[in-house]
Amino acid sequence: MKLSVKFLLFLMILPLIAGEDMSDNDAPKSVDVQRNVKRQGQSQFGEQCTGHLDCFGDLCCFDGYCIMTSWIWPCNW
């Protein structure tokens, strides 16, 4: 029991020691930055594409163009 409490305390303190800034409901800032980095050759909204990986962020390739979708309509059609 004592060991599990110490382990949980360690897991709670670890991000503070590592210097990661955590907000209430967000992932670490490093993850947000990596998620928003545009890869070379990715298309923006309305630009031409050949597949879902060609589109930036949450955009999907539909009928040769990058479009916005929602979680209700994912890119896997």
From Swiss-Prot:
Residues 20-37 form a propeptide. One of its GO terms (molecular function) is toxin activity. Disulfide bonds join 49-61, 55-66, 60-75. The keyword DNA-binding does not apply. One of its GO terms (cellular component) is extracellular region. This is Conotoxin Cl6.15. Keywords: Cleavage on pair of basic residues, Disulfide bond, Knottin, Neurotoxin, Secreted, Signal, Toxin. It is found in: Secreted. Expressed by the venom duct. Residues 1-19 form the signal peptide. It comes from the Eukaryota. The cysteine framework is VI/VII (C-C-CC-C-C). The presence of a 'disulfide through disulfide knot' structurally defines this protein as a knottin. It comes from Californiconus californicus.
